[in-house]
């Protein structure tokens, strides 16, 4: 398989951008790595945070962002046995980990202190060819469309893990805050596939239409609701509130409201990462109602296998729009304005 020496990529040359669409060298895989010809890459809010330096974690610069890359294996290191040339593969947020620490040994490899993060500490998938450690790359079954699979590699795995962390059971209700975004659209479907009832919380008629098309039972529009807490509680069958709340919002206020409409003994799972935000909860209310508040990061390798299996069986469809790689700056603008329903997937130039 012929591999060029140069490729097109979107590169942030300094924190805060701007992005530069230019040619850069094609990397060569190390002994335990695969080189993937990226066909499609999803665009996540994390990619924008990385470029802007919003988080207190040092970010590589210059940086090729992206961590939802789906494509074909075109080269591999001599130690790689998991993949063959021509296999479909996905490169995720967790590009690699040490494999030796306590967290890696107990399958909490996302918590590894030496984890390598695609599009953050190592170059990611907004380029035609990207590297990934073979043990952390995902196998995408043959016949599964790569454009539709791309958002599952981060958004899908992340919300699937969050639902598992919430401990919510079939027949119970989950409130998904930020339901109309890329993560939320997938969270609704995973919840439904797991037999969980959904109250979708977001703003705007376009997001309402999308959520209703995904089968949500109730949509609460925070831009129109006079009493969001009452509306979420009223949407649950017994009026006692949601058994779990999945927080995917990118602003702070929803993180402060969640304890008001989660039911007693309920669980609040924080996944969204608004910059400089804090979680605050009244202590007495949290204690006497036995509310659990926890964070959920990305899934481990097994979570990735399970999340992709839901997709391969046709239980999950990622609502997405396709755009060329050169349009990434426009997509970031829409993202900053909160005007994206579902997910954007970038198509790489041939």
Curated annotation (Swiss-Prot):
Do you know which PROSITE patterns this protein is assigned to? ADH_ZINC
Q: Which PANTHER family match?
A: ALCOHOL DEHYDROGENASE 1-RELATED (PTHR42940:SF3)
Protein name per its UniProtKB record: Alcohol dehydrogenase 1
Cofactor(s) needed: Zn(2+)
- Write out the annotated subcellular location: Cytoplasm; Secreted
Under Gene3D superfamilies, the record lists: Medium-chain alcohol dehydrogenases, catalytic domain, NAD(P)-binding Rossmann-like Domain
Q: Which GO terms describe its biological process?
A: acetaldehyde catabolic process; cellular response to farnesol; ethanol catabolic process; threonine catabolic process
Residues annotated for Zn(2+) 1 binding in this entry: 44, 46, 67, 154
EC number annotated for this UniProt entry: 1.1.1.1
Protein species of origin: Emericella nidulans (strain FGSC A4 / ATCC 38163 / CBS 112.46 / NRRL 194 / M139)
Task: Name the residues that bind an alcohol.
Answer: 46, 67
Entry's Gene Ontology molecular function annotations: alcohol dehydrogenase (NAD+) activity; zinc ion binding
Q: Which UniProt keywords apply?
A: Cytoplasm, Metal-binding, NAD, Oxidoreductase, Secreted, Zinc
Q: Which gene encodes it?
A: alcA
Spell out the subunit comment. Answer: Homotetramer.
Q: Name the residues that bind Zn(2+) 2.
A: 98, 101, 104, 112
Family membership, please give it: Belongs to the zinc-containing alcohol dehydrogenase family.
| Superkingdom | Eukaryota
Q: Which reactions does this protein catalyse?
A: a primary alcohol + NAD(+) = an aldehyde + NADH + H(+); a secondary alcohol + NAD(+) = a ketone + NADH + H(+)
Report the co-factor binding details.
Binds 2 Zn(2+) ions per subunit.
Q: Which SMART domains does UniProt cross-reference here? A: PKS_ER
